[in-house]
Amino acid sequence: MEAGEHELVVEIPYNSKVNIEAMFLLGEFSVKVVGRDQVLDAVSHKAAFSDLTAQGYPFYGGNMTYKIPFISNGGEVNVRANLFRAPVIKAAVDGKEAGYIAFSPYEVSLGELSKGEHLLELTVFGNRVNTFGTLHNCDQKEDWYGPNAWRTTGDLWAYEYQVKPSGLL
């Protein structure tokens, strides 16, 4: 696809008793969401320790792996991730799985490491909250997802996307 404005038209029968399911546009691109508008852009293949929804992945529901080179002094090494929005994080060092981070104290042992350079890989497992979730529900305290959570009205509804933070924050 060339850079510029494009229009994708999908026609389906729709009424108040039918819901539209999420549709996926797959490819090597990022998405910037500002209010109601979305713009596709080049993907960076890099992510900071910050909300992934603001880094080009507002609707992404898959896994994301952070690759972090580090130098060890040798000996027992632990990794802790106490500020994240994901179901679970898988930790690996130098290609060897070390364990999972999901519950307090949000820490996993990488084992005894030799002195020198190593590669830590933290795979943050995705979820579908920003793909299938209540993206127009303005109730920030809503923690239940069921049939009527998608049917908001009045001040609880917004045309602008209400994405939830994700990733290593």
Positions of PLM-derived features:
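A glycine-anchored, Pro-Gly-centered beta-turn/N-cap motif
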Residues: 2-4, 75, 109, 114-116
